[in-house]
Amino acid sequence: MDPNTVSSFQVDCFLWHVRKRVADQELGDAPFLDRLRRDQKSLRGRGSTLGLDIETATRAGKQIVERILKEESDEALKMTMASVPASRYLTDMTLEEMSRHWFMLMPKQKVAGPLCIRMDQAIMDKNIILKANFSVILDRLETLILLRAFTEEGTIVGEISPLPSLPGHTDEDVKNAVGVLIGGLEWNNNTVRVSETLQRFAWRSSNENGRPPLTPKQKRKMAGTIRSEV
């Protein structure tokens, strides 16, 4: 196993522990707590894949961080922080919408790279909006936290989420997954639109009808229906 993979996991475990302590002292806001829950699932998946114990990895990560901090001067830390572009966290969904449990009468699921697409194929003839919570860096989608499809009544009928065992994805991964989800929902005569915020930062554009400019590849996925894909 690559030692850098192990040390990265160890440091991530320790930093999650520090953030958990911050949350326990009620010092974290809603986006902070949201990322904390998502990262916990990701760490569990990575630990299972790597065959590493999270508690043991957390202790090892603490030693790595302490060693680095001893070697790091305040001036070097300031320079490092100044050179790293700052990311922003954008929310279409409330914390309640993100954490709400939902059920599918006709569940369908597809793994598309590092993302999992789920939808209820029993939903027909509805107006649906796709909302997402994600981080942005340099005015471009950086990391998708969660995307969900809502009817006008507020019912959740679809979802795109990162796979805990496969951390890391690109904005192209997200756009491809959105194309597949739209195709599946439209197969049952639903009308689907994407939130203006997600359009702006994933596609760098915004259409009044809520439809992003999908690539020919994504359009083929839509035309081919989702029955064989999700």
From Swiss-Prot:
Short sequence motif named Nuclear export signal, residue ranges: 137-146
Stretches for region CPSF4-binding: 180-215
Membership in a protein family: Belongs to the influenza A viruses NS1 family.
Underlying gene: NS
The protein's name: Non-structural protein 1
Organism the protein comes from: Influenza A virus (strain A/Wilson-Smith/1933 H1N1) (Influenza A virus (strain A/WS/1933 H1N1))
Pfam families: Flu_NS1 (PF00600)
Function: Inhibits post-transcriptional processing of cellular pre-mRNA, by binding and inhibiting two cellular proteins that are required for the 3'-end processing of cellular pre-mRNAs: the 30 kDa cleavage and polyadenylation specificity factor/CPSF4 and the poly(A)-binding protein 2/PABPN1. In turn, unprocessed 3' end pre-mRNAs accumulate in the host nucleus and are no longer exported to the cytoplasm. Cellular protein synthesis is thereby shut off very early after virus infection.
Region (PABPN1-binding): 223-230
